[in-house]
UniProtKB/Swiss-Prot annotation:
It comes from Burkholderia vietnamiensis (strain G4 / LMG 22486) (Burkholderia cepacia (strain R1808)). The keyword Oxidoreductase does not apply. Mg(2+) binds at residues 19, 57, 118. Keywords: ATP-binding, Biotin biosynthesis, Cytoplasm, Ligase, Magnesium, Metal-binding, Nucleotide-binding. Pathway: Cofactor biosynthesis; biotin biosynthesis; biotin from 7,8-diaminononanoate: step 1/2. It catalyses: (7R,8S)-7,8-diammoniononanoate + CO2 + ATP = (4R,5S)-dethiobiotin + ADP + phosphate + 3 H(+). The active site is at 40. This is ATP-dependent dethiobiotin synthetase BioD. Homodimer. ATP binds at residues 15-20, 57, 118-121, 178-179, 211-213. NCBIfam families: bioD. Its cofactor is Mg(2+).
């Protein structure tokens, strides 16, 4: 059995900075002295460069990790169109298979001390006719970090997602407040409300508040996260 740590990163929605926070976590783990690798099992939206199909989110994770995984291991399912994965997969003749992703994760654990698995979109994004990303998280059996995009509506989105994580029998290891809307009114009060509710109902700590950075710099955001607390939680989850 592998002693490597691993965490599943999900979000309250798409386009709320899940990849950015995952990259910040990778930088943080590396600074903590860990060999950190990233898995982006399903990526929708690809571009071609030098005859190779790539994905911007996967590129960002590669740049942050200090352990490089082969592209086919890091992203076993790379879809060309930037749309809902199960729809794109059907059009491209691809079957998004959870067992393949689990096997990729198992191999990644042999190459690093910690593996950050970034989901796609929110917590319940269909992968095929019968399975979604919540099923993937269950199959991997990992603690979950929830990235909350701090914008209007984030309180309900955060609480609903946390409930869904618990309903699947998974541990919410903590959450990150990512300030995606610099003009949002009462941002501090929104964060405080989510913090209090998730602590009371799920014992899930706030792992950090990531400021709205321009330009985006995950290496700077890493300093805004409590990586030591997250490492402790992941180690406890192994026992």
């Amino acid at each position: 059995m592998s002693t490597a740590l691993s965490v599943f990163v999900t979000g309250t929605d798409t386009e709320i900075g899940k990849t950015f926070v995952s990259a910040a976590m990778l930088h943080g783990f590396a600074r903590h002295g860990l060999r950190a690798a990233a898995l982006k099992p399903v990526a929708a939206g690809a571009y071609e460069r030098d005859g190779i199909w790539r994905n911007e989110d996967a590129d960002q994770l590669d740049a942050a990790a200090n352990v490089a995984l082969p592209p086919e291991l890091r992203t076993p399912f790379l879809l060309k169109a930037p749309a809902a994965p199960h729809i794109v997969a059907a059009h491209e003749g691809v079957t998004l298979d959870i067992d393949t992703i689990v096997a990729s994760h198992r191999e990644a654990l042999t190459r690093a001390n910690v593996v950050v698995v970034e989901g796609v979109g929110g917590f319940r994004v269909p992968l095929n006719d019968t399975q979604d990303t919540a099923d993937l998280a269950v199959a991997l059996g990992l603690p979950v970090v929830l990235v909350v995009g701090i914008r209007l509506g984030c309180i309900s989105h955060a609480l609903l997602t946390a409930d869904a994580i618990r309903q699947r029998g998974l541990t919410l290891a903590g959450w990150v407040a990512n300030h995606v809307d610099p003009a949002m009114s009462y941002a501090d009060e929104n964060v405080a409300t989510i913090r209090d509710w998730l602590a009371r109902e799920h014992r899930a700590p706030l792992l950090g508040r990531v400021a709205h950075l321009r330009p985006a710099a995950p290496e700077s955001a890493a300093a805004m996260l409590d990586i030591a607390a997250l490492v402790d939680t992941l180690r406890r989850a192994q026992h």
